[in-house]
Amino acid sequence: MNLIVLFKISTGQRKQNNDTVLEKDSIEVKMEENNVKKADSTGYIVKVGEMAPDFTVTLTDGETITLSSLRGKVVMLQFTASWCGVCRKEMPFIEKDIWLKHRNNPDFVLIGIDRDEPLDKVLAFAKSTGVTYPLGLDPGADIFAKYALRDSGITRNVLIGADGKISMLTRLYNEKEFTLLVQKIDEMLKK
């Protein structure tokens, strides 16, 4: 029997780039078969310092990757979708400031994970944004749901250290936060 209960307590919600954003003092609780997961105000159900939930993703070229097989590498997951305007804004910066700088580093992996879209749409999306970093398919948003509430918005980056633990979580696109993400990746790869 599957039991899913979602509670939301908030002093308010606001619209931002077509996403509903819960205010900072919000609490969300999601229960799945006796497993209680608390979400932060951005919808994340994981926290910095925790082991990143494992998953298997199929890339647009057909390659299949399991996150746990990347242990020992710095991994950046970028949750995205073609219909997301903020994602489209952020992706060229990820391409230029992160991917092109580190794509030849054997200790770094970047995977864009496209939420619930078919292969042809994801390929067209990559072409229209000009990104060359690997994109994976997330049918049903099952990978996304390991990191955030399934019904929360995208434009999320998850930075995972070589030890498999989450080092940084971002939501939406903020220049200062993005600069910190780039700096953190650079620092982690110097070690």
Regions picked out by a protein language model, each given a short descriptive name:
Residues R88-T129, G140-K146:
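Structural microenvironment flanking redox-active thiols in thiol-disulfide oxidoreductases
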Residues A52-P53, V74-V75, I154-R156:
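Short loop/turn microsegments at loop-to-beta-strand junctions
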Residues M76-L77, L110:
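Hydrophobic beta-strand anchors of alpha/beta hydrolase catalytic cores
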Residues K127-T132, D138-D186:
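Thiol/disulfide oxidoreductase modules built on the thioredoxin-like
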Residues R71, F79-K96:
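Conserved redox-active cysteine motifs that mediate thiol-disulfide chemistry
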